[in-house]
């Protein structure tokens, strides 16, 4: 669901709330875009929005030439990196990547990129470069571009979050506190704020549950076609963990605490649906490297292009594309 890294688009979805829903909504400019393909490009319709993109996570059909053009790399280099990557993912060295290995690797990638995002976001907010973030700096980042009618309310919401994560009460946020801000599931106070705002936006009858009807009504902007409605129903079911027809507070808590788990589960379904027994062998990986090169196992190709951004993971290759002085949104553009 949508994190700071996401670039807002046209419609909204429940997911974004679970990484940093409110701050995603308030963000004036988004300096990070590494998760734009499927990573949390969602937000509530009461806020601002982005279409669900889980369906886009399936492996696309690209020629080697087209892939090389998009990645700004040559085909030979891509293929070599893919083979090296296979060996990293295949932890038991049986020349097969199974569902569990794919899941573990994807979680490792997401955790590494999240830490990178936190550092980049901290630098973007800390305008005076003093190593701390003040309330005014946070407001300047997340409030300034909003409609004047909503400005005061949004300032209050930002201030509430600021005070919640300012654990030492010094009126400033350090990197560890910004890390909490971007991961509300790790802080009880922040999670309560998130849950209440989710319910305020979605729970129309005040029973502290979100039905599929409420979900679709809130998510829909204008009339929805059958395909869009079906996708929303599918998305709703993925949040309704006990399948009782409603998303309750306990389910919200579970998803907020571990948003990556939910997303990886959805992506894994797409990734494995066309694989025999849900596995991919080294021979198939090499033969169909173009497709796997833009799958969840490469973070849609980002791992191949910008391995240094994944802190804590040692890759046998380095960034291949010259990194010019541009915004991260340009650097990590969608494939």
Curated annotation (Swiss-Prot):
Residues noted as binding Ca(2+) 3 in the record, renumbered to the chain: 203, 205, 207, 209, 214
Q: Does the keyword Endoplasmic reticulum apply?
A: yes
Q: Which residues bind Ca(2+) 4?
A: 240, 242, 244, 251
Location(s), subcellular = Endoplasmic reticulum membrane; Cytoplasm, Cytosol
Residue positions annotated to bind Ca(2+) 1 are 126, 128, 130, 132, 137
Q: Does the keyword rRNA-binding apply?
A: no
What if the gene is knocked out? Gene knockout results in slower parasite proliferation represented by the formation of smaller plaques compared to their parental counterparts. Lower invasion capability. Longer duration before egress from the host cells. Reduced parasite gliding motility and average trail length. Reduced virulence in mice. Loss of the regulatory ability of Ca(2+) efflux. Impaired Ca(2+) storage in endoplasmic reticulum. Impaired microneme secretion. No significant differences in in vitro replication.
List where the motif Prevents secretion from ER lies.
332-335
Q: Which keywords does this Swiss-Prot/TrEMBL entry list?
A: Calcium, Cytoplasm, Endoplasmic reticulum, Membrane, Repeat, Transmembrane, Transmembrane helix
Task: Give the Gene Ontology MF terms in alphabetical order.
Answer: calcium ion binding
Record's superkingdom? Eukaryota
Q: How does it sit in the membrane?
A: Single-pass membrane protein
Residues forming the EF-hand domain are: 113-148, 153-188, 190-225, 227-262
Q: Where does the chain bind Ca(2+) 2?
A: 166, 168, 170, 177
Pfam families recorded = EF-hand_5, EF-hand_7
Annotated GO CC locations: cytosol; endoplasmic reticulum membrane
What are the TM regions of this chain, as residue ranges?
30-50
Protein's job? Calcium-binding protein. Participates in the efflux of intracellular Ca(2+) and storage of Ca(2+) in the endoplasmic reticulum. Required for gliding, host cell invasion and egress. Required for microneme secretion.
What name does UniProt use for this protein? Calcium-binding protein TgpCaBP
Per the UniProt record, the source organism is Toxoplasma gondii
